[in-house]
Amino acid sequence: MNELRKLSITQMHDGLKKKSFSAVELVEAHISAVENEKLNAFITKTPEIAMKAAKAADEHFSRQKDDLISPLMGVPVGIKDLFCTKGIKTTACSKMLENFVPTYESTVSDLLLKSGAAMLGKLNMDEFAMGSANTNSYFGPVENVWIRKSDGEKVVPGGSSGGSAASVAGFLCAGALGSDTGGSVRQPAAYCGVVGIKPTYGRCSRFGMIAFASSLDQAGVITRSVSDSALMLEAICGYDTKDSISSEKPVPKLSSFINGDVKGKCIGIPKEYRMDGISEEIVHNWERVASYLKENGAEVVDITLPHTKYAIPVYYLICSAETSSNLARYDGVRYGLRVDADTLEEMYSLTRAEGFGKEVKRRILIGAYALSSGHYNEYYEKAQCIRALIRNDFIKAFEKIDYILVPSAPTEAFGLNEKPDPLIMCINDVFTVPASLAGLPAISVPVGLSNEGLPLALQVIGNYYDEAGILNVASVIEQNCGRIIRPLA
């Protein structure tokens, strides 16, 4: 049964078509693993829903027709607990929504399930998607499958989609839905040695995705290979009338663009990303992969993105301001936690004090301050102006180049029991935040292991709506570096 869990999505699909195994057998193998998992990746398990999808898939395959709904039919997947799932508890890993059961389905999870995928359950995450280590969850931290070699210490899986990345790396599911606001798909994918892609802002509907920072939030996917990411992303992209920023631009068949050819492509290396604090091992792999792409016909050039140094403060001002606004709805009146009190004002105060964790409260306070009448122009408005400059840096760069190659994170994953300063945690997103501020597509792909035996990764950033292009470049990197897979226990 463990052998079935090792398969890629493409291999699962081929095996189901050839009747080498049934969807029920495939899903049962994963259900057994989920029931016995020790990573704390799943917080709500839905084996009955997964088995229903598996039986439907087997019935379809028994007809011996090639009119499959999608290559995801019967494939076991997990869904980050930020996406509303009708009739299934959706908590955003917060005490505030501990018992919230949505009456509707998010668009992306609906598309995924309609493609025939078998949902194994809801995945752990940082509370309201705020964090870079998955240590801010009301349901406890997630463990990475990788162990630090020198001291045998457990390490963090990254965040906020830590449950998504850990579950895929741990062979608990073949792929997982995540969300990416400032790097929450790409950074955990990097820490766990898997592939994570954030599409262009607006490619995937935000409807039914619990809001964190609306001008940045975007759904994404995490898988064990680039081709698998293409298949999953195809399933969840597309125009949605229920999301005002949803793009009407047609979605190509992304998997068909993966041809392993980068001849004639121009790849930029921004000098501003060569900053203090980057691991020497990551720099070495960055230079090695750039040389490999050059050997395969790509032109590699130095570029400048001059406003990169402002990305972190700009991001945290904007996302905190939007957090303050979006989370104002959690007041104990309509849904979620309610703490009874003598007055309405006291009920508001007690409910929010008990319902939100420390990191969420920190960002609400920062955001409220930035949006206050005396500071709005000084902080929020200025941050939006600099965001436009960061976006323009990318637009100008893409007039001369096709893709940008940068690290996904400055270091390998840190220890699960280490308590970094919140400011240090923010800086972990230094390489992922700029693309988020600009709304560009980006993919993290593993490139090797550190001396500590922990995954290292690079990121390919593309122009707007060029998900197909970054997937292809990532596939070339994957061919060179191989897949960084931890042996299945």
From Swiss-Prot:
GO cellular component: glutamyl-tRNA(Gln) amidotransferase complex
SUPFAM superfamilies assigned: Amidase signature (AS) enzymes
Keyword ATP-binding: yes
Residue pairs linked by disulfide bridges in the UniProt entry: none
Organism superkingdom: Bacteria
Enzyme Commission code(s) on record: 6.3.5.7
Free-text function comment from the UniProt entry: Allows the formation of correctly charged Gln-tRNA(Gln) through the transamidation of misacylated Glu-tRNA(Gln) in organisms which lack glutaminyl-tRNA synthetase. The reaction takes place in the presence of glutamine and ATP through an activated gamma-phospho-Glu-tRNA(Gln).
NCBIfam families in UniProt: gatA
Protein name: Glutamyl-tRNA(Gln) amidotransferase subunit A
Gene: gatA
